Amino acid sequence: MAIRYIEQDRTFWLDTEHTSYIMAVVDEENFVGHVYYGQKLQYTEGTPAPVYLMRTGEAPFVPSQNNRERVSFLDSFPMEYPGNGLGDYRESAVSIRTVGGHVGVQLNYVSHEIVKGKPALPGLPSTFPGEEDCDTLILHLEDQTTGLTAELIYTTFEKVDVITRSVILKNTAEQPIYLTKVMSACLDLDCTDEKYDILTLHGSWGRERQMERRSLMHGKQGVGSVRGESSHQEHPFIALLSENATQDTGEVYGMHFVYSGNFLAQAELSQFDSIRMTMGIHPENFVWKLEQGESFAAPEVVMTYSSEGLSGMTHHYHDMYREHLIRGEYRDKKRPILINNWEATYFDFNTDKLLKIAKQASKLGIEMLVMDDGWFGHRNDDSTSLGDWKVNEQKLPGGLKLLVDQVNAMGLKFGIWFEPEMISPDSDLYREHPDWVISIPGRVGSLCRNQYVLDLSRKEVRDHAFESVAAVLHSANIEYVKWDMNRQLSDLGSVELPVDRQGELYHRYVLGVYELQERLLAEFPHLLLENCSGGGARFDPGMLYYSPQIWCSDDTDAIERLKIQEGTMLLYPLSTMGAHVSDCPNHALGRVTPFETRGHVALAGTFGYELDITKIPEEDRQQIPAQTAMYHKYNDLIRRGDYWRIASYLENGSYDCYMVASKDKKEALVTYVQVLSRPNFHSRRVRLKGLSPENRYRIEETGEVLGGDVLMQAGMLIAPLWGDYRSRLIHLTEA
């Protein structure tokens, strides 16, 4: 097994193919301490683990427990799951409040079990074994004073060098316990031998997941969201990098949260230069009441270590999510090339307009028409009708089935847009059920995009939302749903939750979303679901569990997408990124880019179109058959291959270059985008990655044959392209 318990020194060894994670139970108090996480250590029976790495000894001006030297000074000890209020002043993993108002908890080792496979987390998205078997360690911990117990759950995915972590807390006492903070994972590292950086992904609407690296300084640094979703602004990810780490060298520790709501991810450099990383639900506005016998399951953290820089971390996450998070028939299936009518028509459409787009699309190699916002109620703008999921027959005379049948007759699939979590004040649903809105009694509610948020913590609200959406999907041959969420949560209050459970609303809302999507997929197992939230505000591993692709950003400009997609590709397989060729001037910022470049950039994702193909220039329209053929030619490679970053436009401000190489190293596709042209500039040298040095490769465009070692070490030359925003694809196959 990949997990072993060594009785002689009470250590736990968790191994993957290239990494080891070691913990130890120490002292009479049975503290669980972190020993090591990094490159794989060879275990030899009878040889003790390097428990000397755990900090011990006196810490001046710090309280101690029982005056013992070993771990009595908690403020310097590498705790595996630290509590609060008892002398460890660093970031805690769990904090509580008793009915008496007291704080303070320390969870100590009681027992453990090692099992084959991986238990599911109740009501939460989580990774699963798939074809690769897993081993799971469950540490049973207890705080005897409060009666709080914990199950620390560790699962090893050996082939992809990943360890997942989660926590289940339970109240065994007679009195209630209030959880005020629950982190899913804590990682204490002794990094006194060198300096480290942290890497996070920041952004806003229209420019999500921008990579940002900074030096780790003393104190706490991190990112989080209190918006009710993972957000445009920050991403539920943090990485610790050795100061000299590059794209392909150096140490990287990554933590990624399988959750779609409020989160907090932090790294803390202590007074002793040790580092504590924590990740979990954001404690702001979070209080969870546990009655006797009740449990709370925390969402999962996907943790990995790479000694091969960011590329190593990226490959671990890509392989992990492809095989162990994404579900359903579309996980391994080519996605249809779709055209979405949003940027083509916005709310101004009818059956005739949609059929004209569909007719043209069917001639160009496009495979599905998606009807976006505006098809229901009396919705001609964004001020009305959310919640009234019934067809507007003034726009679609004869109803939805007639339109879908006509589109299907042209050889196209049909998809549709919903926003099931929202409600318009001007809607029949709101007039009938104003109490279904998340709101604070006595306070005028806040609107965003002219809408309120439905209280999905309530079963009757979830049932109504599901039944409304399901009725539409049953009414016609609808094979795709775009699930949108166009505002964040505020005015937090639920008329159903008692006073001492109002702090549970944020999390209960997210659980409600998960339940809805799970029910939808169970009812419609062949449905292709694409999640969206004002673009990429809920692009996270939690959503990926339900939908194999997520709309990457509402900014479809090819040049802005280079930065957005670079940050996204750092963690997510390319097949998960919703990416479309859109119109120019671009609707988000007015930039004009060549149609060819728009196609090349969108090819890195799911690939589709978001424009009125009946009105675009003929020169552009004539390129679409070649682009759709390009998608089919390279799709298997892009969906299954290894992604390599060669150059970053975010860093150099001039050009972007990345490639995908097949797992067997027999094929590769290089994408090169010249953002800004330069006068009197010679060819640019580009060194490829991920090839076999022994293989010889033919460059399809020129017929030239070069060795893999030559292409990776000496590189290839790319001549300057004429003009800004120009691009080139370079296809290589084994000669």
Regions found by a protein language model. Give the residues of each.
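Polysaccharide-binding surfaces and accessory modules of carbohydrate-active proteins
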Residues: 5, 9-13, 17, 21, ...
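Conserved, mostly hydrophobic/aromatic
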Residues: 18, 167, 293, 339, ...
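Short Pro-Gly-centered flexible turn/kink motifs
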Residues: 104-109, 288-307, 726-733
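Carbohydrate-binding surface patches
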Residues: 238, 247, 649-692
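Aromatic-lined carbohydrate-binding/catalytic grooves of carbohydrate-active enzymes
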Residues: 330-464, 480
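Active-site neighborhood of glycoside hydrolase catalytic domains
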Residues: 397-399, 431-433, 437-594, 606, ...
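Catalytic cores of secreted or luminal carbohydrate-active enzymes
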Residues: 596-647
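C-terminal beta-strand-rich structural cap/linker in extracellular carbohydrate-active enzymes
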Residues: 708-735
